[in-house]
Amino acid sequence: MATKGDEVLSQFTQTVVEEEVEVRDEDKLRIGIIGTGWIAESHIESYKRMKDVKVVAMADLIPGKAEKFAARYGIENCKFYPDHKSMLDSEKLDAVSVCTYNTQHAPCAIYALEKGVNVLLEK
């Protein structure tokens, strides 16, 4: 049996979800992507659907790979780095997606956490 509180919460949630909210660029979460292989594809697709998130930096060990990845997904005004350390040392990020080979997850995640950056990581 639904209570009055359940009804109010349902109406509020529906209103919040349906309402389009414009988020200023400076208020968006700043995301960096480490590794631009196939795992990064699902991450970037999700980020592109979020209005309060902006991918601002990418790092990949293979020269030119991050630039091609960004172009393929229409990511503009993004900076590119040859490795995760140079990106994390240079950018003010809210979070990073670690999309590297499993053997590189720990070093990338630990370095980001030591810099005070939140980490999104699969496995």
Give the role of each language-model region.
Residues 1, 8-9, 84, 109:
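Extended hydrophobic/Leu-rich segments
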Residues 2-73:
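N-terminal Rossmann-like dinucleotide-binding module
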